[in-house]
A protein has these predicted regions:
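Membrane-helix entry/capping segments
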Residues: 1-6, 10-11, 15, 19, ...
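Alpha-helical transmembrane segments of integral membrane proteins
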Residues: 1-24, 270-272, 302-339, 347-469, ...
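Hydrophobic alpha-helical transmembrane segments of multi-pass inner-membrane transport and secretion
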Residues: 15-41, 275-311, 339, 418-441, ...
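Interfacial "coupling" helices/loops that link adjacent transmembrane helices in transporter permeases
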Residues: 16, 294-336, 683-721, 775, ...
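Small-residue-rich transmembrane alpha-helices
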Residues: 32, 36-39, 254, 335-401, ...
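Membrane-proximal juxtamembrane linkers immediately C-terminal to transmembrane helices
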Residues: 42-63, 89, 131, 189-191, ...
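Hydrophobic, regular-secondary-structure patches
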Residues: 44, 58-116, 123, 155-160, ...
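Mid-to-C-terminal secondary-structure elements
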Residues: 118-134, 147-275, 474-661
Length: 791
């Protein structure tokens, strides 16, 4: 029976090559799109969920008041972890992870690498599933003299030699023994490091750094099986307040399920409420709709050809075929077609996956060696085939043989309404996606064009390691005298990142709530404003060479002045409730963007050397050659900091990263909008071909009676264009509602303009007209005499 159905299905598909090709192409593109989206979704939802006891693993967070609301941050202090491990019996294991202070120069002989490392507690490998290729995970980090390397770093340092037991030099100071080689980290993890050092080594470097007010690491806890997170949160909430002086700290600790940390990162009033999970939901819907559109193509074309297949059904029923056997045959046809499309889809995915990975910024792969992949893929394809063929199978098998064979059965008119509905559904989704794409791209451009407050072109920076800090003046002199740079300044952090913030500041006229205001904190030297091209609005910039009191001088940005309600800020005195130097305001600088360009600028204090300098900023001279001067800069750094590579970064590129997520969304939505249009047009092309074929006698008569090619083309096109018009009317409010909700998350946002809908409508009409006109012109230009004779 199966063999007979297969043979009949294959024969039917080969007999109608055009419709089979259209169906296979549409389903293949739809399946490929769905597979790509599913790969991305699987990567997102599995992010850091592969660790043991993930349901009991939590990341500790702080919740504090700021500017009248609650905000959340996850950097915690060093003594927090040991205190929790000691005093909270419901906690099974505590692990600290410090990714900010372990960036050393790792050397083996003449091989030097300034790369990203992390300090971790001894039990790191018992909490996180990062397998060691060599070494014992229980003992690899139990000594201050140990180091664990990733496989990639081990190969860079030792080539093909076994790294285990060998020593590497850390910052030209200490020798560490390699006690583990770690399999390179997967793409679906938040952890980023090339080597791990034990906290015992950190304690050796910084023996007295146990300040409960200084948070710069992540603290993870694994609760015991019977412990509840609600009870733990209640007990741990005030631990920071209990270990600090009265009034010194206001932040409360709570535990966030780590399995949700990647997907739920947005905060509203102190609670995690959303984040990338919204993208997962959105692209899940897009995948479903794209597949649905491909299935609609199959349904429309199958039912459109019902008149031609009616006699086949009638004869088979007269010959004794049961309706159930006809249903099985028609569904078999759709499954066979889906299998062929599935093979094409796998090929499309394989060809496009590298480009797709670039767009989404991931390392997605298909594990062909996994038998479950093939099982799921086959089920997915078969279900798609069944879904696509179910309605046509039941409809075609319902024909009454007497009416069919007598010629009184006219199925086309009966099917017009459902077919129209399906076409409207297709184009509604496609038009909505196009509108969303235009608005997302507009929002990204709006943020990109927002005044950053400083000039980014030709501006670069190098983070100071090794001898760079000691030799800063020599490096600065070398950069300027060689002509490599036109200006040089040192700062505590890059202009695109926040490395320090704090509250507890009081000033004349401030109140209790003001002390909870969080300020971004930044150290800069006297060349800062000229190097960055900042605009000083009041007072002057920091110049502690000519003004000795500027060692405690502070520049405020406009946001800080507004938050502090200062009418005449220059000369105002600012004190910290926690002690430290008394600051005096020497100037006001125009707001400049450090954090998100989509969000309001936060209050900021810029001081002299109080927080220390960690970054050299320099503006590269364009004359006579940008590239030549960059090489000169490299020589200067190599001369005065020879042990460290010249790891230069550029502010225009660093700033562009801030738009990556929104640009990625816009690109993906645009890509799938184009694919949706393509699939819809395939179906429209097939329907137009069938309609032209079914009305061939009418067209011939009209041509003989004098109808022009334009008249015939308009006759065949107007019905489809009317459907596209209905789709536009339905899609526009849907797209407006979706985009209005999306834009509401951005304080700085565009308005949704009428022209977006007008352009989309014209584009949709043009695409539909071009698709239908191909078949309409072909029918109109055909010889009417030959068509009438054949009839």
């Amino acid at each position: 029976m199966f063999k007979i159905n297969f043979r009949l299905s294959l024969r039917s598909l080969l007999r109608h090559k055009l419709y089979s090709f259209i169906n296979v192409s549409g389903l293949a593109v739809g399946l490929a799109s769905a597979i790509l989206i599913c790969l991305w979704i699987q990567n997102e939802v599995s992010h850091d969920r592969f660790h043991p006891n993930i349901d009991r693993l939590y990341l500790l967070n702080n919740r504090d008041q700021n500017n009248g609301g609650l905000y959340v941050y996850n950097l915690t202090c060093r003594p927090l972890g040991p205190a929790i491990q000691k005093d909270y019996p419901e906690v099974e294991r505590v692990v600290r992870y410090d990714n900010g202070t372990a960036n050393f120069l790792i050397s083996n002989g003449d091989k030097h690498f300034s790369i990203n490392g992390s300090f971790v507690d001894t039990g790191f490998f018992s909490v996180f599933n990062f397998p060691l290729l060599e070494g014992n995970p229980s003992t690899a980090l139990n000594s201050a003299k140990n180091i664990v390397l990733t496989e990639q770093l081990a190969k860079k340092l030792f080539g093909n030699e076994d790294a285990m037991g060998k020593t590497v030099k850390v910052d030209s100071v200490d020798y560490q023994t390699v006690t583990g080689v770690l399999k390179d980290l997967p793409g679906n993890t938040n952890f980023k490091f090339d080597y791990l050092l034990p906290y015992a080594y950190y304690s050796k470097l910084y023996p007295n750094n146990n300040d409960w007010n200084n948070g710069n690491l992540l603290t993870f806890v694994t609760l015991k099986p019977k412990a509840t997170v609600a009870e733990f949160d209640r007990k741990v909430a005030n631990i920071i307040i209990e270990h600090t002086k009265p009034g010194e700290a206001t932040n409360k600790i709570f535990a966030q399920p780590y399995k949700d940390a990647w997907l739920y990162s947005n905060v509203e009033n102190g609670q995690y409420v959303g984040g990338r999970i919204e993208l997962v939901k959105m692209f899940s819907l897009i995948a479903i709709f794209i597949l649905l559109i491909a299935c609609i193509n199959f349904t429309n074309l199958s039912t459109a050809r019902s008149e031609k297949r009616a006699k086949e059904v009638g004869i088979r029923k007269v010959a004794g075929a049961l309706r159930s056997s006809l249903i099985v045959q028609f569904i078999s046809e759709s499954i066979l077609l889906a299998l062929v499309a599935g093979i094409g889809a796998v090929g499309i995915v394989q060809l496009t996956l590298p480009a797709f990975n670039k767009v989404v910024g991931s390392r997605l792969v298909i594990d062909y060696s996994n038998p479950w992949y093939w099982v799921y893929a086959l089920l997915f394809i078969v279900l798609t085939g069944v879904m696509a063929g179910l309605y046509p199978a039941f409809y075609l098998s319902s024909f009454q043989p007497v009416k069919v064979l007598k010629g009184s059965f006219k199925p086309v008119k009966a099917l017009l309404t459902p077919r129209k509905v399906l076409v409207v559904l297709q184009f509604t989704f496609a038009i909505a996606l196009i509108i969303c794409t235009i608005i997302v791209e507009g929002q990204v451009r709006f943020a990109q064009n927002r005044d950053a407050g400083y000039r980014r072109n030709n501006l670069a920076f190098v983070i100071m390691f090794g001898e760079a800090k000691k030799n800063y003046e020599l490096i600065k002199k070398g950069l300027l005298s060689s002509g490599a740079a036109t200006a040089v300044a040192q700062t505590s952090a890059p202009m695109t990142e926040i490395w320090a913030n704090g509250n507890g500041f009081v000033w004349k006229g401030s109140n209790t709530d003001d002390s909870k205001t969080n300020f971004n904190l930044y150290s800069a030297d006297k060349d800062f404003s000229t190097t960055m091209n900042l605009q000083i609005l009041q007072g002057r910039s920091i110049d502690y060479d000519n003004y000795k009191t500027d060692s405690t001088g502070v520049l405020l940005n406009e946001a800080a002045v507004n938050e502090m309600r200062l009418k005449n800020p220059v000369g105002e005195v600012i004190r910290s409730m926690y002690g430290g130097p008394v600051l005096h305001v020497i100037g006001v600088v125009k707001n400049f963007i450090i954090e998100s360009p989509y969000q309001p600028i936060n209050p900021m204090m810029i001081v002299g050397p109080i927080f220390g300098y960690s970054v050299i900023n320099f503006r590269i001279n364009e004359r006579p050659s940008y590239g030549e001067n960059l090489q000169k800069a490299e020589k200067v750094f190599s001369q005065y900091n020879p042990q460290y590579p010249f790891n230069v970064r550029f502010y225009d590129k660093e700033y562009a990263v801030k738009f990556a997520d929104e640009q990625r969304v816009g690109t993906l939505v645009g890509l799938f909008a184009a694919l949706t249009i393509f699939i819809s047009c395939l179906g429209l092309f097939g329907l137009a071909a069938y309609m032209a074929e079914s009305r061939i006698k009418e067209i011939g008569i009209r041509r003989v009676l004098g109808a022009s090619v334009t008249n015939i083309t308009g006759l065949l096109s107007k019905e489809f264009l009317r459907l596209v018009g209905i789709s536009f009317v339905v899609a526009s409010p849907i797209a407006w509602l979706v985009m209005h909700s999306w834009l509401a998350g951005y304080p700085y946002r565009i308005a949704i303009e009428w022209w977006v809908f007008a352009v989309t409508g014209v584009l949709a009409f043009f695409i539909a007209l071009a698709t239908v006109s191909v078949q309409a012109l072909r029918a109109a230009l055909a010889n009417p005499v030959r068509n009438l004779r054949s009839e």
